[in-house]
Amino acid sequence: LRPEIYGNIADEKVELNGLLYVIERLPIGIEECRFINLTSEEGYAKSHFKANVPPKRRRNCYRIDEDQMNVVITRGRSDIYDILTHLTFIFIESHKIKNRVLLDEAGEVSHDWKKLEIAVQQNKKLTQVEKEKAISHTANILGRTFEEILDIYDAFGSATTPDRFLHVIYWLGKLAIEEMVENNKRTITFSPVLRERLGHHIHGEIWATNIKEVLKENNLLGRPIHVISANMHSVMNSIFAVPALKTKFKNQSDFFIYEELSKSGANEVRDLVEAIALKQGMISLPDTSGTNIDVQIFDTAKIDWSKTSFPKAQLGEEKPVLIVMDYAFGEQAYETIDELFKPYKKETFLNAQSISIMGKAGILEGGKGDIMIPNAHINEGTADNYFFENELTADMFEGNDIAVFAGPMVTVLGTSLQNRDLLQFFHESTWRAI
């Protein structure tokens, strides 16, 4: 397979964008670790070990010592596929680095490698001159131009570790060289408890029970329930943001206001909208179960609809309850919905009326930001799929200056395994996937 995300994985030169994508989804320091141990939730949160959460994937990881990283798996097999494909990628890239710098089996290395090692071992922020010298040597090692490396250099860094790019390249290469010269193999293990618990819905059950208990405490269990899978700000903003911020953003469109709220420094306006929502029946449930899925519950009876974006909303006799859940991860979507719809304490059935899923997906027809309406599903092979009829149709979304496509949807086991040729086949063959 040549997964699309990983770019030039099959070429001799090191793939930079793919490496950035993967490094952002793995814990900081993993490039230094020879032993990766996948565990379930086994009590590390109660220890002196500090949780190390990757910037782009919410999963707890713990650096046990200089050689070992533990990664906590709470989201089922999709999480394991995700991690294994990312680790496979960095291992492949590390061997490319090794092949370019190792001159013989005795461990003699190239001049460029020695210079990179000196730069990394300084353990201080490099001056502009030192940085550019190190980039020049690294460009030779990676088979890339000076400019290509300069362009991506800062994306790897942070305020505390601006030169992390060099550090990542050095340690990937170093471990691959030691594998070759000293036969110190990198090892991925699964803890016995993780093997035992996989597929048992442990975290999903705790998560769902917690939601049902909050519904019961607030006398909402018997009301009609609509489940919405979306970002935590989406539903809250669509109901409360525009009226709340109309005076601040005079004569601006609704979409302008939503964009302002999404900006990274917009905490003040976001807090304002959230404060209004909390006063009008929103209950916020940050996750404590290990699923990493936060939840908001909206009691529509407590909302003053005249002061919302939907002043003409007609709610009927029994005012419904909205349960907004953050995006699930792969197989976890089945686990959480399966557990949520189980009766509370065996005798109280939930009055579930609808599930709405706002999701991101790769589009085969059209472009980024277009709307896709799946009308059939081609599944990637595990039995854990929850089937339902899609009541949305393309014509409901026409006329908003956004392109809309309807057709079959292909699901793949882990984002990281999307392959252009395979997807092209599904798009162009009789499957006609979008």
Give the location of each predicted region.
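Glycine-rich phosphate- or other oxyanion-binding loops that anchor nucleotides, phosphorylated ligands
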Residues: 1-139, 197-205, 294-434
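Long non-globular sequence segments
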Residues: 148-164, 171, 177-184, 189
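N-terminal glycine-/serine-/threonine-rich phosphate-binding loop
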Residues: 175-221, 330-333, 343
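Short, basic and Ser/Thr-rich N-terminal targeting/leader segments
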Residues: 221-223, 351
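Short, hydrophobic/proline-enriched secondary-structure or compact coil segments at domain edges
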Residues: 223-231, 321-328
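Adenosine ribonucleotide-centric catalytic and binding domains
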Residues: 224-226, 230-293, 371-384
